[in-house]
């Protein structure tokens, strides 16, 4: 095993300029991540320097066998925390050979929204709180839970410490540091209300970069749990009953919201979000109806409600924002399995581009 570990950690920089690029893309479910690696002649610093590539879409549920080639376009580069050195992770999106985005490519539509001049001038900031649950591989039961049984009631686990309250901290800390190494703008972690559930935060990041970073952070997390022999679940309600679900609360602000008088801009934006509540809910993650019940710090899925410091609301405004008259708000509706390209761009589209008077 020591030899294998030595080879895995082999430093190639002293013998070759060649690097390994791990191309990452989203698979056929819209939630599964796939990746494969290729050798490049030397270090690169921009996605435009990278070649496009292809994969067998019939094996990912994204193309028929008789016309299976899907083309991936490099979009964002991150340092590889697993291979280290000059090796890189490359976030890609997927297209047909004719250059059309395939149905699971939500990045292309998001990029159009974020490149709109009206959106660009607002310099949209996002801070996304990604919750997830760690599961025992052989049983699909949360880490730290007795097999076929339940731990004590919720209460001591949120931000808890101790062997009877925090399960999987090594994984969480490894992920935190790996994301920082990679260049993901990860801003924090914490244990969640349900035991075995954790959260990491990404942001504030501007525009589509926030979504790229969430996807790469998810990829890094999946790779780390693979090493540990643990399964990560993004199911919004992994355990039925009196247990918290898992969300991806999305904090958002625009330039005008962050300036003097921004609170009025925030209230107008929230009004627009309320008018398009059904459209947003439909795009905010599969199975979200199991989570948004009006209990466990959620609003009912059929009701739009906003409030200051109200964690039972659809949209929460912080006390500091109310006091200062400017700042940001939190959309608490997105599920943990949401597509960040969809959620971030839809919030921008509704609050900046959508005319609720037309």
UniProtKB/Swiss-Prot annotation:
Domain GS beta-grasp, residue spans? 19-99
Annotated GS catalytic domain ranges read 106-358
The UniProt record lists the keyword Cytoplasm: yes
Provide the alphabetized UniProt keywords. Answer: ATP-binding, Cytoplasm, Ligase, Nucleotide-binding
Q: What's the EC number here?
A: 6.3.1.2
Which PROSITE patterns does this one have? GLNA_1, GLNA_ATP, GS_BETA_GRASP, GS_CATALYTIC
Protein name per its UniProtKB record: Glutamine synthetase
By sequence similarity, the record places it as follows: Belongs to the glutamine synthetase family.
Top EC category: ligase
**Origin superkingdom:** Eukaryota
> Region Disordered: start and end of each range?
38-66
The chemistry this enzyme catalyses reads: L-glutamate + NH4(+) + ATP = L-glutamine + ADP + phosphate + H(+)
Q: Could you give one GO CC term from the UniProt record? A: cytoplasm
Q: Name one GO biological process term.
A: glutamine biosynthetic process
Any further remark recorded for this protein: Irreversibly inhibited by the herbicide L-phosphinothricin (PPT).
Record GO terms (molecular function) = ATP binding; glutamine synthetase activity
Species this protein is from: Lactuca sativa (Garden lettuce)
The record's subunit annotation is:
Homooctamer.
Q: Which Pfam families match?
A: Gln-synt_C
Give the location in the cell: Cytoplasm
Q: Which portions of this protein are annotated as coiled-coil regions?
A: none
């Amino acid at each position: 095993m020591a030899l294998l570990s030595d080879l895995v950690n082999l430093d190639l920089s002293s013998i070759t300029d060649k690097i390994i690029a791990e191309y990452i893309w989203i698979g056929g479910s819209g939630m599964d991540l796939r990746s494969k690696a290729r050798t490049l002649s030397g270090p690169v610093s921009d996605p435009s320097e990278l070649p496009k590539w292809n994969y067998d879409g019939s094996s990912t549920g994204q193309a028929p066998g008789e016309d299976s080639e899907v083309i991936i376009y490099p979009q964002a580069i991150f340092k590889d925390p697993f291979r280290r050195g000059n090796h890189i992770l490359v976030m890609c999106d997927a297209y047909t050979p004719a250059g059309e985005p395939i149905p699971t490519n939500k990045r292309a539509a998001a990029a159009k929204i974020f490149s709109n001049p009206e959106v660009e001038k607002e310099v949209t900031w996002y801070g996304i709180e990604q919750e997830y649950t760690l599961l025992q591989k052989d049983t699909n039961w949360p880490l730290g839970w007795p097999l076929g049984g339940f731990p004590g009631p919720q209460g001591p686990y949120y931000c808890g410490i101790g062997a009877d309250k925090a399960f999987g901290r090594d994984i969480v800390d490894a992920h935190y540091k790996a994301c920082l190494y990679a260049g993901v703008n990860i801003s924090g972690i914490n244990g969640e209300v349900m035991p075995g559930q954790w959260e990491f935060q990404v942001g504030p990041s501007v525009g589509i970069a926030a979504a790229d970073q969430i996807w790469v952070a998810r990829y890094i997390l999946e790779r780390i749990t693979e090493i540990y022999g643990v399964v990560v679940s993004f199911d919004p309600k992994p355990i039925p009953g009196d247990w918290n679900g898992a969300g991806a609360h999305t904090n958002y602000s625009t330039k005008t919201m962050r300036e003097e008088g921004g609170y009025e801009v925030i209230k107008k934006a929230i009004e627009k979000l309320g008018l398009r509540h059904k459209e947003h809910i439909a795009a905010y993650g599969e199975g979200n109806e199991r989570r948004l019940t009006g209990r466990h710090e959620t609003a009912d899925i059929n009701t739009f409600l906003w409030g200051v410091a109200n964690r039972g609301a659809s949209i929460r405004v912080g006390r500091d924002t109310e006091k200062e008259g400017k700042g940001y708000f939190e959309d608490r509706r997105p599920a943990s399995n949401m597509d960040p390209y969809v959620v971030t761009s839809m919030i921008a589209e509704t609050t900046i581009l959508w005319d609720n008077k037309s």
